[in-house]
Amino acid sequence: QDIHQISFPRYEDIKAECPDAKYQYLFTLDDTAFFRVALSHADKMHILEVTGGKFINRHYMRSAAPKEYVLAAITGFHLDGWYDKNHFCGRCANRLVEDDVERMLRCPVCGNMVYPRINPAVIVGVTNGDKLLLTKYNGREYKKYALVAGFNEIGESLEETVRREVMEETGLRVKNIRYYKSQPWGFTDNILAGYFCEVDGTDEIEVDMQELSMAKWVSREEIPTSLEELSLTNEMISVFRLDKGDF
């Protein structure tokens, strides 16, 4: 599998070629500041030509390196989309301005505050003895193995989301729900919370074919070893395969 090496144009590269470019601070990573830059398509292509770079599809980030630049790229993508979609106040239609203290856009007229959109979602590893419930999405670009997943609803705890999503996608009931870890997922503006749980009662699967193309129990020995390291989903699958958790 090809590993895509990520690099970013530096300030001096852009300044030399596009002296009138406008910069917007995003974040700092290991003492390196990252900025959002407004450039025309022609200027972007020129900068890439000068620096020897090229654009890659965001989905290649799943297997890219170095990992700290993957984090920077995904987070930058998340913030770029938020800024791009929030120029005007949704309450009074006046132009929003950046707050001086926190990551927030504020309306100077009515006081409306707009924060970055972060969607809470769960990733669920359902176990059945030495087997793990693996799924594949229906109608999505990502075609590899996944776990049951879904968005948290208003008024719902994350544990309730786990039970509901497993039931909706596979018809299974679960018990002994345990939190594993979380991961920001800027591809889709999400914060992911990973959980492991056990099947409760029958292990007969009823697949929701609108959401999934398949769902099946897979033993540790049958789980593929060539999983991408980036995603929480694949980390959880690997943790189960290697029997490193409390299952």
What spans do the regions from the language model cover?
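N-terminal strand-loop-strand
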Residues: 87, 104-147, 151, 173-174, ...
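Short linker/helix segments within small regulatory modules
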Residues: 98-103
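Short functional micro-motifs and their immediate structural scaffolds
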Residues: 94-97, 115
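Nudix hydrolase/Nudix homology domain
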Residues: 1-86, 141-145, 187, 208-247
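Surface-exposed, charge/polar-rich loops and edge strands
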Residues: 156
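Hydrophobic alpha-helical positions that pack around
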Residues: 148, 162, 166
